[in-house]
Curated annotation (Swiss-Prot):
Designated name of the protein: Diaminopimelate epimerase
Key word Cytoplasm present: yes
Chain positions recorded as substrate binding sites: 13, 47, 67, 77-78, 167, 200, 218-219, 228-229
Reactions mediated catalytically: (2S,6S)-2,6-diaminopimelate = meso-2,6-diaminopimelate
SUPFAM superfamilies with a match to the protein in the record: Diaminopimelate epimerase-like
EC annotation from Swiss-Prot or TrEMBL: 5.1.1.7
Sites annotated Could be important to modulate the pK values of the two catalytic cysteine residues: 169, 218
Keywords of the record: Amino-acid biosynthesis, Cytoplasm, Isomerase, Lysine biosynthesis
Organism: Burkholderia thailandensis (strain ATCC 700388 / DSM 13276 / CCUG 48851 / CIP 106301 / E264)
Pathway: Amino-acid biosynthesis; L-lysine biosynthesis via DAP pathway; DL-2,6-diaminopimelate from LL-2,6-diaminopimelate: step 1/1
Length: 289
């Protein structure tokens, strides 16, 4: 069987995008997702994105995300920007703004005249039980409006903020993001048993009150060149701690994102993320019988 696909990226976070809206697709088993995402024997991607017909009122499309390990996850901000470019470029809609069903609700994606996409990422959640994060036996430390939690990692204690952007994040502020042992600490934090659904680990260096550098070790994908939900979680944590002011420019290895949040006034306000979405190539792959 032949499978048509589009390869895209958002700030270097790369995706295989499949159209399940206008055509029938084979079942997306864990094995098939892993095969497509394999960088040596497949197409290669951090995640696979699936466009489907919505199942809830008020949505134009349904957006599903699969990590390169085959597991389906709740949200991906960089993928959301690629999603709206895909559906417009492939004639599935001519709307500048589309409403998209994801696991935790419906989000709005808007294509701007300059080619960048603005994503309404929704409001962050800080309650540990809803991230989820198990705080039993831990003594938190207040910093601004936030609570930091101690986590033993490779013989050291790391103080983290926990945030949900529809998916779980652990954010810590570091002195030097480039020098920090992300590839050692990231896997340990990702699989810490206090995170029953595992977690995305963010490492943020504050450059100024409106600028940060960020690396993210993503759950099920490892360190990626950019992580949209990770950028939102990091900025929300920094504003809540009193160390950042909106808007914030987030520098990742793959590019730059702009995050805006009026959370200092109202924590129920949505985070808005602006950034690029790029089509790399279109292709067809032969699937094993």
């Amino acid at each position: 069987m032949k499978l048509s696909f589009t390869k895209m990226h958002g700030a270097g976070n790369d995706f295989v995008v499949l159209d399940g809206y206008s055509r029938a697709l084979p079942p997306l088993t864990d094995a098939l997702v892993r095969a497509l995402a394999d960088r040596h024997f497949g197409i290669g991607a951090d995640q696979l994105l699936l466009v489907e017909k919505p199942t809830v009122d008020g949505a134009d499309f349904k957006y599903r995300i699969f990590n390169c390990d085959g597991g389906e996850v709740e949200h991906c901000g960089n993928g959301a920007r690629c999603f709206v470019k895909f559906v417009r470029d492939h004639g599935l809609t001519d709307k500048a703004s589309v409403r998209v069903e994801v696991k935790h609700g419906v989000i709005t994606l808007t294509m701007q005249d300059n080619g960048e996409v603005v994503v309404d990422m929704g409001a962050p959640v800080f309650e540990p039980a809803r991230v989820p994060f198990d705080t039993s036996g831990l003594d938190g430390r207040r910093e601004g409006a936030d609570t930091l939690w101690p986590l033993p990692v490779n013989g050291a204690t790391r103080w983290i903020s926990v945030v949900s952007m529809g998916n779980p994040h652990a954010v810590q502020i570091v002195d030097d993001a480039e020098a920090f042992p992300v590839l050692a600490d990231g896997p340990a934090i990702e699989r810490d048993p206090r995170f029953p659904q595992r977690v995305n680990a963010g490492f943020m260096q504050i450059v100024s009150r409106h600028e940060v550098k960020l690396r993210v070790y993503e759950r099920g994908a490892g360190e990626t060149l950019a992580c949209g939900t990770g950028a939102c979680a990091a900025v929300a944590a920094g504003i809540r701690r009193g160390q950042l002011d909106s808007p914030v420019t987030v520098h990742t290895h793959g590019g730059t994102l702009t995050i805006s949040w009026d959370g200092a006034r109202d924590e129920r306000a949505p985070l808005m993320m602006a950034g690029p979405a790029t089509t790399v190539f279109e292709g067809v792959i032969d699937l094993p019988a």
